[in-house]
Amino acid sequence: MSPSSVKRVWMYWTKTKMLLSIKKFGRKNKILDEESVELILEVNKEQNLGARRLEKIIEFQHGKHIPHNAIHKVLLHHGLANVNRNKSKRRKPWVRYERKHSLSLVHLDWHDGKFNGKKVCAVLDDSSRCILAGGEFDAETTENSISLIQEALDNFGWLTSISQAMTDHGTQFYANKRDKNGDADSRFENFLEKNKIKHIKARVKHPQSNGKFEKWNDTYEKNRYRFDNFDNFVNWYNTIRFHESLDTKWYLQTPDIAFWARLPEGCKLKMFLDRMETELNVGDRI
């Protein structure tokens, strides 16, 4: 305590014979109006994310700034968040790597789903984090893996072919028994080669190589129960949920928006010409 504070307390005591009350430091707690509380609950129901993330989304979508601490209190009050006393206040520096263009690299992986006991696999675009194809299966098989790549090609191959596919060394993707030349008869690898897709194998015992897919698995486990089927979940993930890894300084993005925005320029030109041709054909028929 500074000498001036001691003097002030002493002078107050000599005049009033009472202790000087100490005011609370910091800002007063902000009391949110009912409209703000309803907005927080509405956006949380749609996005199912934490307070720090909801703060950015609410400001981006609705132009209204609500501090994340106030949002967290609302979530706690409604049983939508937990108190985490061990959470670090300082976030670690975050470095990410991603491809510049959509369809230049996709990730595949199998996951044991806890929601319904199914085996889950998807084709995830590296640049946009968009799910290009996926499903819940009874077994992890090479046939199912191939069918998902084929589905992605059927849906988006008219734009441009997938350049590369990254997987782990699972038997669904890779034949571990090889001859002296390093060759093996793997149906999945043969399928990729036939479609001119380069197969990239993630480093063994190095989960960071497929970290984007691990993040998607986590999102699946936290949100799958909210949807009647897998397709509805993927539609929410692709088109409604703002993905933090896609944030820019000026705007937020869903994987679907990022996918179309990050296509190579040649693909965008092709889309424009195809649309012009369609409109001209419609005009000729009229």
Model regions: which residues?
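Basic, flexible linker segments flanking DNA-binding modules
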Residues: 19-105, 183-189, 255-258
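Mobile-element integrase/transposase regions
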Residues: 64, 69, 76-124, 128-130, ...
